[in-house]
Design a protein with these regions (language model features):
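Internal catalytic domains of large membrane-associated glycosyltransferases
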Residues: 45-48, 52-69, 83-372
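A transmembrane-helix-recognition feature enriched in membrane-embedded lipid enzymes
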Residues: 48, 356, 367, 371, ...
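Non-transmembrane, extramembrane segments of multi-pass ion/lipid transporters
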Residues: 365-379, 445, 449
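Juxtamembrane inter-helical linkers in multi-pass membrane proteins
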Residues: 441-457, 483-500
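C-terminal amphipathic alpha-helical interaction region
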Residues: 504-506, 515-608
């Protein structure tokens, strides 16, 4: 519907004046609108659902009426309704939202009232900072004890290949002395994270009913684990429940802006996503609980025919596992009401782009997976959404290139008509989230106040616009490289506040600067009438190395924090688990602390390791030396 409205808005802009480019431009424009609409619908649905609830048009589950779209009290739509008033979507410090069915299993102190099936928390790691890993283990074990879940075991599943890191992992495990923590290291990380989890299931799966799967940078509270267990026990047809992990702990300007954006924009998106996905939600690979028996029976992943990058092992396994779980008749739910579930994000633009390169290859593999028989509609939609996200870059670039060769008057008319619907689909979801926050004093306080939240959104939007030319070119190049047969390694992601130097930024970004400058310069020479439109895009592209360097600075991140910018509730009022984890990490980083943690996050975790930016971009951009090791996940 949004796509059709956008096409109708343009009127006669796609008229005969465009000549032979008329229909190709229209097809690309429809694809651009559809891609933006796909991501704009959930937050707008969330806003509408919240407004209806506030006006009394949609009742909460358990109040004598049905939530809008809920088929039963336990459906995920009802779970969204139980989250509270529509302006109360950010969890209060130390509190996690919980559905009525799960709450019945807890006492007034938050402890589990009755013993349920056994659960294991899995922490897969590969060549990570051991101090960071076991600081998280200590924090989560303490939190599980506080929730009365001492019988929940925590398994550190190591694929670490570097001898120094492996030795330190084993030493920290022995020093922990906790009978509820188990450590296992594989000598060969066959299958990466998928193989790591599969080995655990084959070895220990019969001992547990559920597993809470984390990433190496994840953190989750005991209370949230208990609520996940309770809901799984109460709803026997649910195979997976995905929580929403929020980004924490990084201090660079780039990472703090990312953490701010995730905290501000995600709740409204999640409200709408629960409404339209129902029991056909997605799995993101971590911070989720899984019923082990059907996972073992139905979610084993085959090796795709052919060679990498489109063949071989499935890299982005999570969405495929969710699709297989649904195909077998099991439900997959997204539960945005659960708080105290966290992850970390890349500290800078270079590392973020390297991760996108890996994810691009993994999602393009799903073009083959979508053809598998027996997959359900929602499973195929999630696979298609990932593909369309990365296909958007080439579509936008091709549209701009073709528009440059259209007659000048017709091109200017089309640009003027096409820009408003595209801009609306980008801005409206963010504006809706901002309005929700500004309307609530409590929520705006979690972002440093109304003025700080407004300023943060404006600066975040400005950086998004400045980086758009680079991001589109990068995405287009990644897709072209993958389809052209260039595979990428899966290297360990930095878990520290790594800064980017001028040399690294220029070395890794110069192909995009050269390609963009040549294209814009050539069009300006061939079509002087388009120069005024092209120059702003060229200026933003040329500024991208400086943006990559400056946004990676911890000093600027801390300066923004002192000024009240890009604050989140996890800084203003952090949970007990975050405080425990940060204290443990601070102790490990004291000058007399042993091991790689002493370096305070200024480079790769161990000597000889490449940065993630170099390793990830090498797969499709700059030929630099490769690593033999790979990360679990």
């Amino acid at each position: 519907m949004l796509t059709l409205c956008g096409v109708a808005w343009t009127g006669d802009a796609f008229g005969p004046a465009l000549g032979v480019l008329r229909w190709p431009l229209l097809a690309l424009f429809v694809a651009m609108l559809a891609g933006l609409a796909l991501h704009a619908v959930p937050p707008l649905l969330g806003l509408g659902l919240g407004a209806m609830r506030r006006l009394g048009l949609a009742r909460r589950a358990g109040t004598g009426g049905r939530a809008v779209g809920a088929a039963q009290a336990g459906a995920p739509q009802a779970g969204a309704a139980q989250a509270g008033a529509w302006l109360d979507m950010v969890p209060s410090p130390g509190r996690s939202g919980v559905s009525d069915g799960a709450a019945a299993r807890f006492g007034s102190d938050g402890r589990l009232a009755a013993a349920g099936p056994r659960t294991a928390v899995l922490l897969p790691v590969c060549n990570e900072d051991p101090a960071r890993v076991f600081s998280a283990v200590r924090a989560m074990r303490a939190s599980l004890g506080d929730a009365g879940l001492d019988d929940v075991d925590l398994h550190v599943l190591s694929d670490t290949s570097q001898a120094g890191a492996a030795h330190e992992e084993e030493a920290l495990f022995r020093a922990l002395g906790d009978p509820g923590v188990f450590y296992r290291r594989r000598t060969s990380n066959t299958g990466r994270k998928t193989g790591n989890i599969a080995e655990f299931c084959a070895r220990c799966g019969g001992d547990y009913a559920f597993m809470v799967v984390l990433d190496a940078d994840s953190l989750i509270s005991g209370a949230t684990v208990g609520r996940l267990m309770a809901r799984m026990a109460a709803e026997p047809r649910v195979g997976m429940i995905q929580t929403i992990p929020y980004a924490v702990n990084r201090e660079t300007l780039f990472a703090r802006m990312t953490q701010f954006a995730m905290r501000l924009y995600t709740p409204l998106w999640a409200e709408g996503a629960v409404l339209w996905q129902g029991p056909g939600a997605n799995y993101w690979g971590h911070n989720a609980i899984i019923r082990i028996a059907p996972f073992l029976e139905h979610c084993a992943l085959p090796v795709l025919p052919g060679r990498a990058p489109l063949g071989g092992e499935i890299l982005c396994h999570d969405v495929v596992e969710a699709a297989l779980m649904q195909a077998a008749g099991w439900e997959v739910h997204l539960d945005p009401t659960l708080g105290d579930t966290f992850e970390e994000v890349p500290p800078n633009l270079i590392d973020h782009t390297a991760r996108e390169r890996r994810w691009c290859q993994g999602n393009l593999q799903h073009m083959r997976v979508m053809l598998w028989p027996r997959l359900r509609l929602m499973g195929r939609m999630h696979l298609g959404a990932g593909i369309s996200y990365y296909a958007a870059g080439p579509v936008w670039v091709l549209f701009a290139m073709l528009l440059g060769f259209a007659p000048a008057a017709a091109a200017r008319h089309l640009a003027a008509e096409a820009w408003p619907p595209l801009l609306a689909l980008v801005v409206l979801p963010r504006l809706a989230s901002l309005l929700v926050v500004l309307a609530s004093r409590r929520q705006s306080a979690a972002f440093g106040g109304r003025l700080a939240a407004l300023a943060g959104v404006m600066l975040d939007q400005a950086l998004t616009v400045l980086l758009m030319p680079l991001n589109l070119l990068v995405s287009a190049q990644f897709v072209a490289a993958t389809l052209g047969g260039r595979s990428v390694g899966w290297s360990t992601q930095p878990r520290c506040d790594r800064g980017v130097g001028w040399g690294e930024a220029l070395r890794l970004l110069w192909p995009f600067l050269a390609a963009g400058s040549a294209w814009v310069g050539g069009l300006a020479l061939l079509l002087p009438g388009h120069a005024a439109v092209l120059l702003p895009a060229l200026a933003a592209l040329l500024a991208s190395p400086a943006l990559a360097v400056w946004s990676s600075r911890v000093s600027l991140g801390r300066l923004a924090r002192r000024g009240g910018l890009f604050c989140t509730v996890d800084e203003v009022a952090p949970s007990r688990e975050l405080r425990q984890f940060r204290r443990a990490m601070a102790a490990e980083r004291e000058p007399d602390a042993p091991g790689p943690a002493r370096r305070g996050g200024v480079g790769p975790a161990f000597p000889g390791a490449m940065t993630a930016g170099e390793a990830g971009l090498a797969g499709g951009v700059v030929p630099v030396r490769q690593r033999a090791d790979s990360v679990a996940g």
